[in-house]
């Protein structure tokens, strides 16, 4: 009798959370898996942060369309071919999930960086600014970002 009661409770509780099994239509990837996915040149890299955030550093080859702007969907459809996979990132992963949902709804195949640009940095992945690779110390944004070609100037001889 006790087993039946417990099983009833478990069944009832599991029915309260159907969204856990719901397909969101896009894939959320770790920084390592995202890096592998965007190595494919057919994948379009989309950074959905603000223009200011993007200018401070971004993933190589990314284009910037701010998801918080009212014309995001219009700019996305005018810029992004539906025949390509779109790899979306933002700062922490929240805006990229929102953008991924919007893009998926209008017919795009989408992957998104689950941990966002912060996770990308923490994983020690390459970051670019003004077309040049930059180095961020300790995997975190520093007040002063040092370009890789300037590191020798910092070495005490």
Please describe what each predicted stretch is.
Residues 2-5, 19-43, 52-85, 96-157:
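Rhodanese-like catalytic fold shared by cysteine-dependent sulfurtransferases
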Residues 89:
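Short, surface-exposed ligand- or partner-binding patches at beta-edge/loop junctions that are enriched
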């Amino acid at each position: 009798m006790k087993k039946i009661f417990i099983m009833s409770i478990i069944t009832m509780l599991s029915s309260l959370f159907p969204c856990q099994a719901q397909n969101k239509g896009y894939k959320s990837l770790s920084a390592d898996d995202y890096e592998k996915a965007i190595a494919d040149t057919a994948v379009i890299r989309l950074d959905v942060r603000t223009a200011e955030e993007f200018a401070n550093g971004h993933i190589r080859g990314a284009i910037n369309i701010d998801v918080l702007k009212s014309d995001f969907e219009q700019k996305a459809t005018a810029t992004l071919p539906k025949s390509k996979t779109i790899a979306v990132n933002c700062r922490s992963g929240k805006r990229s999930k929102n953008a991924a949902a919007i893009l998926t709804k209008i017919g795009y195949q989408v992957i998104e960086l689950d941990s966002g640009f912060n996770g990308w940095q923490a994983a020690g992945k390459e970051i670019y600014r003004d077309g040049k690779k930059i180095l961020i110390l300790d995997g975190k944004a520093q007040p002063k970002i040092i370009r890789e070609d300037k590191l020798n100037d910092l070495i005490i001889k």
